[in-house]
Amino acid sequence: MSRSIRIGAAVAACAVMFVLGWGVAKTGVGQAVPFASLTDLERDFTGRMQNVVLVGHFTIEGRETRGGSPERYEIASVTKIDEDQWRFDVRMVYASVDVTLPVVVPMVWAGDTPMVSITDFSIPGLEGTFTARVFFYTDRYAGSWQHGQY
């Protein structure tokens, strides 16, 4: 093998490792705050969010339909990965979207209620940005979403 091919292969391998490293850091894969260090509320939340399905309806402003359109979020797990960063391993099904991926989002607490709070937030694998406030209380969820122009 010629020297230039070996150098090219080494550069390509470095580029692939960089992209993989960036992806792992961005998604928080492999990271987790030790379970023992979670508060009681955080432990309760992670327990409730194991292998759950959130089913609801959404509307698009200006195009509301009676009852809305169906949405479905299949959550395999939720993991705290940093002070206010949580990873949702989720399958999202809404409109023409059907994707499974890890999504790392900031979470804030309103007393005993966890809330995802994102503004102009990019989710790798999905186009556009998202703004949302979604809260979870016992076995319920509710919130407001905006995706791109909708």
Task: Identify the residue ranges that each predicted region occupies.
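Amphipathic/hydrophobic helical signal segments and adjacent flexible N-terminal regions
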Residues: 2-49, 53, 57-66
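Central antiparallel beta-sheet cores of small beta-barrel/beta-sandwich binding domains
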Residues: 41-42, 48, 52-150
